[in-house]
Amino acid sequence: MIKVTKDLVLHLENLARLELSEDQRESLMKDFQEILDYVELLNEVDVEGVEPMYTPVEDSAKLRKGDPRFFEMRDLIKKNFPEEKDGHIKVPGIHR
């Protein structure tokens, strides 16, 4: 069984670039341990002979038949954008 230690939580905190309080670390240690204990319990379930289920809902996304055709207003739409590069519209990047 995997044991969640303070060192492990500190390592994960560093990897995630978080700054947690001591109370938050203790809470995470408890939560992580509960999650890992539950996964360990699931690993003990006997699934011998059980066929894998890839999706609980069969045929959930029916696709309609396509009718490809050329979009004729392409040049009109491109005129509304300030920049174009290699036949594509160019928009500002999204930055945080």
From Swiss-Prot:
<keyword id="KW-0648">Protein biosynthesis</keyword>
<protein>
    <recommendedName>
        <fullName>Glutamyl-tRNA(Gln) amidotransferase subunit C</fullName>
        <ecNumber>6.3.5.-</ecNumber>
    </recommendedName>
</protein>
<dbReference type="GO" id="GO:0006412">
    <property type="term" value="P:translation"/>
</dbReference>
<dbReference type="GO" id="GO:0050566">
    <property type="term" value="F:asparaginyl-tRNA synthase (glutamine-hydrolyzing) activity"/>
</dbReference>
<comment type="similarity">
    <text>Belongs to the GatC family.</text>
</comment>
<dbReference type="GO" id="GO:0005524">
    <property type="term" value="F:ATP binding"/>
</dbReference>
<dbReference type="InterPro" id="IPR036113">
    <property type="entry name" value="Asp/Glu-ADT_sf_sub_c"/>
</dbReference>
<dbReference type="Pfam" id="PF02686">
    <property type="entry name" value="GatC"/>
</dbReference>
<dbReference type="InterPro" id="IPR003837">
    <property type="entry name" value="GatC"/>
</dbReference>
<keyword id="KW-0067">ATP-binding</keyword>
<comment type="subunit">
    <text>Heterotrimer of A, B and C subunits.</text>
</comment>
<dbReference type="GO" id="GO:0050567">
    <property type="term" value="F:glutaminyl-tRNA synthase (glutamine-hydrolyzing) activity"/>
</dbReference>
<comment type="function">
    <text>Allows the formation of correctly charged Asn-tRNA(Asn) or Gln-tRNA(Gln) through the transamidation of misacylated Asp-tRNA(Asn) or Glu-tRNA(Gln) in organisms which lack either or both of asparaginyl-tRNA or glutaminyl-tRNA synthetases. The reaction takes place in the presence of glutamine and ATP through an activated phospho-Asp-tRNA(Asn) or phospho-Glu-tRNA(Gln).</text>
</comment>
<keyword id="KW-0436">Ligase</keyword>
<keyword id="KW-0547">Nucleotide-binding</keyword>
<dbReference type="GO" id="GO:0070681">
    <property type="term" value="P:glutaminyl-tRNAGln biosynthesis via transamidation"/>
</dbReference>
<dbReference type="GO" id="GO:0006450">
    <property type="term" value="P:regulation of translational fidelity"/>
</dbReference>
